[in-house]
Amino acid sequence: MKKNYSWLLFLLLSPLVVSAQPLEQDASFLTGKLENGLTYYIRHNAKEPGIADFYIAQRVGSILEEPRQRGLAHFLEHMAFNGTTNFRGDGKSPGIVPWCESVGVKFGANLNAYTSVDQTVYNISAVPVRRKAVLDSALLILHDWSHNLLLTDKEIDKERGVIHEEWRTRRAGKATQRMMERVLPVVYRGTKYEDCLPIGSMDIVDNFPYKDLRDYYKKWYRPDLQAVIVVGDIDPAEVEAKIKRLFGSIPRPKHAAERVYYPVTDNDRMIVATDRDSEQPIMLANLYMKHNVVPDGEKSNVGYLRDNYIESLIISMLNARLQEVQQQAVPPFLSATAHAGRFLVSRTKDAFWLSFGCRQENVKGSFDAAIAESERARRYGFTEGELQRAQDRQLKVAERQYAERNDRRNRYFVNKALQHFLSAEPVVTETLQLELIRQFNRTVTPEQVNRAAKRLISDKNQVLVVYAPDKPEFKLPPNDTLEQYVLNAQAATYAPYSEPQLAGELIPQLPQPGTIVGERTGAYGTKVLELSNGTTVYVKPTDFSKDQITMRLWGEGGTSRYPDSDAPNFPFVASAITDAGVGTFDKNTLRKMLSSKIAGVTPSISDDTQQLSGKSSVKDLKTMLELTYLYFDQPRRDTVAFNGAIDRMRSFLTNREANPQVSYNDSLVAILYGNHPRMQPTKRETLDRVSYDRVWQIYRESFADASKFKMLLVGNVDIDSLRPLLCQYVATLPSSKNNTATAEPTSRKKYPTPDVRNADETHLFKKRMNTPSALVNIFYTFEEPYTPKSDLALDVLQRVLQTAYTDSVREEKGGTYGVSVGYALEKDNRPTAMLRISFRTDPAKYETLIPIVYRQVAHIADRGPNPVSMDKVKKYLLKTYGQNIIDNGYWDYVIYHRLQDGIDFHTDYEQLVRNLTAGDVQQMAKDLLGSHRRIEVTMLSE
């Protein structure tokens, strides 16, 4: 039934609008609450046929732990996968992970959970539910998670090591994580948030009594704090009946503990919390201005969405100003962004804040410049032009959401339900959302926005958090000095913001259109159009996303056409162009001109190709093609923008090697490629060898002759509307075919790109680390034909290995948070395959774990893959194939690789998966070991 929103339009246009006017909630959700307090959300969604997502959310997190339980909320989340009443994993009944993977639901990708300060959420996603037994079992898992975890002594002890390794993974190489742990007691002094991060205390994790975990589970996992969410290709009434029958019998505990949401105190004087870490490369500052949150009971009204709308306008406009400042020849800060939302980790306090990277040689200047823009906005507000652009952008986003309202994947609707249950966010339809935005655009005045900016951006209730390098050469100003930087900047005098009037057209003078000289039907249902300048256009019309079109325009060439001596310039060829803007417009002006458009184009250059890639809405296809024309034929040269980017990069790279992970990655690349000049990292000293003239020349030569380019468009494209646009913006690109090519490469010679060295080696080195770790990478390379079958066999091999390592290295040994296995198959130079195995662990364990890694590979080469594991992988691949073929990105990938590499990854893919044998995978493992090309690189903490 078509809903009539005229009542809302009348109310919004009326001067007597009441902010408390209730919102109509999205009726497509079937919602309810059982007698025991459990909430449920159910929604049918046919976008993914035969697929559904199952979630259970808890209004429970690490903030509820008692001191002796620090880390147990997160620990309990892990234990949910290690045995329940109906999924024991003891041989009598399957465990949750094995059962899920038996139906194509992959652990990690589809089966997962997270714990935060105030919530814990579990998911079983992308479940094939055409069989009712599968749907019933997925609900049964949610039921068991809610109150039927086994929590056996043995499984608890096994998981301690896994948690410890997760702690190591999260902290190692992540200085901001460590510093955040240390500043929270200062920021939240006297509140429960002083020590509340979910990872907890490793001393407790390693030693807590079993009873403490069971007590936490019994106290907090209960139906009045839980919600079941099911979205997908299901019958909502049937699922509702099942939920009532299955979950209704769960008892609501008597004398249940109160779920307290702990307050955050306000402060008269600024709180300054600073911390230093030897692995932190740059100084980061976050200036918070705390505000009260909107009570949950006041969020289901028009006024709440209106306030959010105004707030988002303010943040958008302020960030645009900060980006302008960043484009200066010598930017006063490395980066700066404005935000509004939750204050750090607390649900009970909101904030506006500025985040900015400081120049270490001029910390005060960075503070001054960032705060100047927030103060300018607070005092003088925003211009009518700024406001109009921000409102246009809001409307464009709402229009796209409306256009694609029937194209949403399950997760979109799951997130709506999660936000409603966990944060009381209103659930409204895209139709109502669009109508609200239209009315807000008409009724919200500049004066209202500027008054809101004064309330949001304050000089009261402030908190300054600074993360800085711990280096002798960097002198961090004392806390009172940093506080004074803020106060002085907030008291300084500023002029109002002003901007020049924008031009009307991206391309003021259009060239004479070209023509389409031929049309035919191509592979995969594409329409192939030959243009008069020699460019070939492939169009794949789809209706998967009603308001999306993807584009790529590419040609052969790339950096392999240039000598090794140009290698320092390669990383800047594309970025120098985007930093400069395009045509007659600098980057800031271009951003403003595109504010009401959903269209963008980005240049890139790889070893063998140069490319322009973009996305647009259906209405803004013309704009995307205009940008394509400009980036190809009229890139903009801007020395000021280039020098500013190099200057920022130089500051970013000052302490580059402070992070051990950076040093490790540098060593990996050097070892693998023998210090090849094309594989050198960009360091501070490298910047001295970068030439803007040469960067510009490489770009112009790369995009000089469109006759050698192909274009691919995928999405909701109307061919008849497209033809004149192609004639105007693509057929007019410079081309040797019509003698308009703008340049010729200095050399047609193709320089060899580096391969991984042919070696069988083991490397070990040490590096000082703040979190003791061993990082291990093992690379196998071998010659392998580049075919769909070899790609599939290698994919299955890496997935089977991933499962084996999860079982043996993570679960049995508790030796790592996870072993990552990846592969690559290349056809250039010579057809080569690579398999990479990597993990992080305790330095005391790496010598025990590495042999296990090798044994698993040898086992598959000797005996073949585990048949159960291989069957699970094939089911997962077939399921994801069904999901992929209704996605524009999939078709872009498939068609591009057919055109560029001559490889058909689509035709008969399902049959290829079904026909792949254990022998095929075993042979791949044999080839891998038989090549004797293995490089192992381990970095240990000193």
Give the role of each language-model region:
Residues 1-22:
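Bacterial Sec-dependent N-terminal signal peptides
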Residues 20-42, 235-323, 327-329, 388-392, ...:
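Proteolytic maturation boundary segments
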Residues 41-43, 48-65, 71-73, 91-144, ...:
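M16 family metallopeptidases and their MPP-like homologs
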Residues 72-80, 314, 573:
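Active-site His/Glu-centered metal-binding helix of metallohydrolases
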Residues 79-91:
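Metal-associated gating/positioning segment near the N- to mid-region
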Residues 148-156, 444-448, 452, 636-642, ...:
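Peptidyl-prolyl cis-trans isomerase
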Residues 160-212, 216-223, 229-231, 236-243, ...:
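Hydrophobic, small-residue-rich alpha-helical packing segments that form membrane-like cores
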Residues 204-243, 681, 689-729:
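Internal metal/ion-chelating core segments
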